[in-house]
Amino acid sequence: MKRFLATSLLILLLAGKALACGWGPTHNYYLFSVYNRALMQNQFIDRINSNWDAYTNGEVKEYDHDKLLAFAKRKGDTQMAEYLTLLDSYLNICERQGETWNYPTEEEKMEMDAKLKNIRQVTSQKLKTRLRSQNALLHMRANMLLGRHADNIAFWTSTVADQYPNSVYKDMMKDIYAGALVKQGRRDEALDIYAELNDMESIRWCMWDIWNVKGISKLYAESPNSPALPYLVQEFVNDSQETLDQSKWNDDGVSSEYKKEVADFISLAERAVAEGKTKTPALWKTASAWLEFMFGNKQLAETKSKKAMEMEGTDRMRDNARVIRLFITASNAIDSPSFDDFLCNEMQWLSEKAKEESTDGEWNTYWSYNHYSEVFDRMVFQPITTHYKKAHRNEIATAFYSLIDPPSSELENVGSVYSSNFYSYLDYGDVDDALAYQSFIQGNPKGKLEKWLHERAYKSEDFMNDFVGTKYMALGDWPTAIKFLEKVPLAFLNQQNINPYMGTRSYSVEPWRNFQRESSWEEEPKVILTSNKKIDFAREMIDLETKLAIANKEAAAKLAYEYAIRNYQASYKGDCWFLTHYASSTYDTLRVGEKDFLACCERYLQKAAESKDFQMKEKAYYGLAFIPTEPWRNGEWDSSSNDWVYKTNPASTQYKALKRLVDLERSNPGKTAEYVSKCDVVIQFKKQYQ
């Protein structure tokens, strides 16, 4: 079994995204989003770093005390050097106070307070210098850590608010001022400031004690346009999805208490829309629609989602309403040209939104921190797949998968396709699905949706011919496999991830006598192929099958043995799994609809065992004993004896094969081959079998 360990690594690398037990995206992302989640990050760091970049003429791109101090000294900037020294002292105190595993001692706290008081004193004397904004910010920071919140309110009001120029430093001071207001019980004023600064992280911190419908309802009654409400509504809706997702793992499902909580929220949302006090009814109506859908009222949800599209709200809220309407409509839709057109328009819009929100112009699900690319992903994995499979138009769903994380079409990057969602989806389908997709990319698209997809879908003919041919290899349909594989150039095969295995392993090697495994965990080097091993194999199998059909019994036994070897090697257990698949794992099993190469191997080893030749019979029995379809014994750990306890399975195929092998050996003393007599499994079996 050790020889499979390295290949199991390959499957993790190639298809890790699709493994249930490995890392991978959920594909059940939150759809409800009424603010950019980047707002939950620090809103000031990038602006601060831009200032450092400008100050050093691009030499230092982000805060680095030592590099910045060296630059300031080299420039002769005494004010900046003094400021950086104070800033470093402050940041060190912040880091020390943030330690959760090693809290500061009372002595350390006194020492830190003394340093903060010094920072406060020194910066107060530098409020008319060139760096007055930086020093004023540091002054307020020191006050904050000292708990002097009233001082910060007074300092902002009397000194900063009307006298300091607009800058990132002033915005940070205003943020600290808002925090001081919270400490003084003036939360509503603070919330307005946090909203103005797009500081959703602080809004969340401010609202830590409001999380249920009762709290949200109270806040709405007091302030129907509170800046905290969008955050609280989004949290409630997405928490509801989380609760539903978690309920799938228990027998009781969602509790009746929680269902009532959701129903109460829907009532609140509808009341908020009806009363007309909110400036953002789209927020509430969309929340109501999405909760209705998640909890099973799908037609009502669709009606509500369409109404939400007509209501007022921020641009983000209106986009959110559009996302929810799209998902619900696609989930409910009956296949028709009009639905195709609707879906095309909406998915085009969605892809453009994903590009807009991305900072680097990329929008695939895996490498971008992007809400809209995740919506695209969930749309494809859920309603689009369900809809087009049901409509027997799976090629449309397949084309959509190729848009999630588009594989490279460049020859040197052939390997990228095998780690894509497109490949995973195509691979778990059958050959008819692959043929339908190939026909789609080769044909003339009809309708708006098909044309849009056809322009963007992955269309490598080399990949598709190799893929379809390999699917036929897995079915044991050699002539049809050859027809497709012959169209694939060696240049393509030389770039595949399976190339090292294809170039170094032989399907004629007896797997029960010789293991063909890589020498290390290092990546195997590519091999320049001189022929397509899949075609070579298919032709040999056709030749063997032809000869087997006409051979006499003794000749047929030898041919059957060779045929059995090749069947095993082509199976998911074989060293030449690359003949029928693109990856291998110790967790692999026979796929539905594919040829059972292991069962075929067993059948032909049985035929080989009918030979009168001792060596052939011995090899056949040994091969049968090697195949662990039904193990000859099972082991359980016994804690009392602190050892393994084994129970034999006389009815298993492996037990019977080992019995025949040992019986053959005992009835032919002196003839046993060394590889049999030294086999650990045979030795263990003989101890049990007398």
Enumerate the predicted regions with their spans.
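Extracytoplasmic/secretory-pathway proteins
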Residues: 20-141, 146-690
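Sec-dependent signal peptide recognition
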Residues: 2-8
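N-terminal signal peptide c-region/cleavage motif recognized by signal peptidases
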Residues: 13-17
